[in-house]
Each structure stands twice: as C-alpha cells, then as structure tokens.
C-alpha cells in the first residue's frame, strides 16, 4: 500500500492549467478540433457540443468516447472529425477510462517518459452510458480526487443510437420505441427524468465542480468546460442536447428547443463549485423573479414525441415543473421540500 508520504510526493504531477473564461464570442479562437467528417443527423446538438468542448479544451486534450451516438457517428472509417487524440471505450466505462487515462499520464510523467505538462482528459458519454449503465463508474471516478479529468454527458433523453429506447433521462410521457402511446394506456413512460447532475453533486462532496449546460448558450458551455478543466480533480458536466431523430422535430428548431428548455424551467443552468451553488443566465433570472417562465406547452408542442399529449397530460407536466421551482428546497435542482 502506498504511504501518505508517497501520495503527497505525487502531487507535483497533478498539473492543472489556468483556462481563462472567454468574454463573448469575439474572444473565442477560430481553430477547430472537431471538424468535418462526422455522420451525425442534421440538427444534432450533441455534435455542436463536441465542437464546443474540443475548442474549449484545445490541442493538448485526449477524448475518450464511450459507445453511443457520438461514437458511431464520429468514427466512420477514414473520416473521423477529431483533430486531437481520441479513444473508444465501452458503453458503461467512461468514468473508468477517464480515471485510467489520467492515472497513466501521471505515471508516465513521474517516470520521466513524458514531459510534465497539463493534458486534458475528457470522457464523453450519452445518457445511456452516463445516467444509466455508466453511473457507478462515474461515481467512482469522482471519488478519485488525485486525478484531473472531466466527464461530459450529452443527454438526448434516449438510447438514440439504437433506435430511441427509453433511458433514465427520458421525460415523462415521451413516445419512444419502448414506450409508444397505446389505445389502452396513452402514457407508457411514467417515470420522471433522472436528476443526474444534482445527484452527483450532492453525493460527492469532494468533487469540486458539477454543472449543467445547453448548446443554445455556446459561450456558457465553453467557459464551464474550461473551468472544469482548470479547477483540479474530477469534474462532471451534464448537457441537454435536442435530438431530431428521437424528439421528432424539424432540424431548424434545434437551437430554439434548447432555449425553450431553459425558458420554461425544464432545464435549469447552474454550477456547483467547491460546494457553492450558482444559477446562470435565464435560470438565474427565473429564480430571482426577473423572468417569467414560459408555459411548457411551447416546448412540448414543438416535438412529435409529445404529439399524443392531451390537455390533461400537458397540465400535469406543467404542474411538475411548477413544483420544481416553487416547492423544491433548491428550486429546479434538489427535489426535497421542507417538512
């Protein structure tokens, strides 16, 4: 077993870098590290997320991609879009792969086989590989505080790569391959969406940074990625990504749906940094009363997966969102109420 002294002697090899926030799009460099050559669907916001993430990390970044949409669509033979090192890992092992890669880099630097320099380790996974099958590996990774890494979950609210099966992130009532509305039972998926980011933030007090993002707000995405890579230790970011195939919408509305998810209060934008909670953008304005939440029907009505909703279903969905902001201990985030 390694002694505390030896553990402390390795601290020099946990290099972090200072990635300053970009103040507006004009400050963002033009160089791209996720380029043409991918095979994502038109209107896929997860592809936009990969582009923003890679740009935020820069050239000294290693990407680990678990099985999912962003693996299959980005690894067509001889046409990868990645201009930085990338490795495939199994569906539920993004956390394990990130920890192992960060540990290997540390050993190589300690043995003098690599120059001591900050190298970003980012593991990406979908909601199936993150909120479901890979949750235990992510939890374990967030407890290894000696390693610098970021786990980024792109959440399109289904197993979209294998034809839109229900995941733990699928919203209540949504039509999917495994939850089609029927004549006897109209609502087949009766579970509310898993609150992954808040769950990981609350359950891992040593994790310095957990955040939510949405590609409709690209500068916010990049700055949160840069903060996660700079703070030191394992971090987690949860992105809500509209999916034209699974959500059944015209690709031209992808960006607008991302905005509506925030403006209706369905998807709060926040971060937990060193245990301190902070809302961002319109979510902060909703919390302070400066912005009135839009009705959820504006969001639901743009998507074919909710086309079977009756007025009763829409009102129920609205009541759940109202409760998130009006009754929860931390509005929109922590689903506890005072006794």
Q: Where are each of the predicted segments found?
A:
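Flexible, low-complexity linker and terminal segments
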Residues: 1-6, 13, 241-339
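Cofactor-binding active-site loop characterized by glycine-rich and histidine/acidic residues
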Residues: 4-154, 158-160, 164-174, 189-190, ...
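Arginine residue identity/basic-tract feature
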Residues: 23, 39, 60, 106, ...
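Short secondary-structure junctions and interdomain/linker hinges
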Residues: 48, 60, 64, 207-208, ...
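Glycine-rich ThDP/TPP pyrophosphate-binding loop and its adjacent helix/strand module
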Residues: 117-118, 132-150, 154-292
């Amino acid at each position: 077993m390694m002694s505390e002294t030896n553990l402390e002697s390795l601290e020099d090899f946990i290099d972090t870098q200072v990635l300053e926030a970009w103040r507006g799009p004009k400050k963002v460099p033009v160089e791209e590290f996720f380029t043409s050559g991918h095979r994502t669907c038109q209107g896929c916001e997860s592809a936009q997320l990969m582009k923003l993430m890679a740009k935020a990390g820069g050239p000294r970044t290693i990407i680990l991609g678990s099985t999912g949409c962003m693996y299959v669509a980005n690894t067509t033979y001889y046409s990868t879009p990645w201009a930085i090192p990338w490795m495939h890992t199994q569906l539920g092992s993004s956390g394990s792969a990130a920890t192992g890669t960060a540990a290997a880099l540390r050993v190589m630097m300690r043995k003098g086989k690599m120059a001591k320099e900050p190298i970003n380790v980012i593991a990406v996974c979908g909601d199936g590989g993150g909120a479901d099958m890979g949750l235990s590996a992510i939890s374990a990774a967030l407890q290894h505080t000696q390693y610098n890494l970021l786990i980024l979950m792109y959440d399109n609210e289904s197993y979209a790569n294998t034809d839109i099966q229900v995941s733990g992130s699928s919203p209540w009532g949504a039509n999917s391959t495994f939850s089609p509305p029927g004549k006897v039972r109209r609502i087949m998926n009766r579970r509310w969406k898993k609150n992954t980011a808040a769950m990981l933030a609350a359950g891992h007090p040593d994790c310095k940074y957990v955040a939510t993002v949405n590609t409709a707000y690209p500068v916010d995405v990049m700055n949160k990625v840069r903060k996660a890579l700079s703070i030191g230790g394992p971090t987690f970011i949860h992105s809500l990504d509209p999916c034209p195939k699974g959500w059944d919408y015209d690709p031209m509305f992808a960006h607008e749906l991302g905005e509506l998810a925030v403006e209706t209060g369905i998807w709060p934008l926040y971060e937990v940094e060193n245990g301190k909670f902070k809302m961002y953008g319109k979510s902060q304005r909703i919390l302070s009363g400066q912005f009135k939440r839009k009705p959820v029907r504006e969001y639901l009505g743009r998507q074919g997966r909710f086309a079977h909703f009756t007025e009763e279903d829409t009102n129920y969905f609205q009541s759940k969102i109202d409760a998130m902001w009006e009754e929860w201990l931390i509005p929109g985030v922590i689903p506890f109420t005072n006794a």
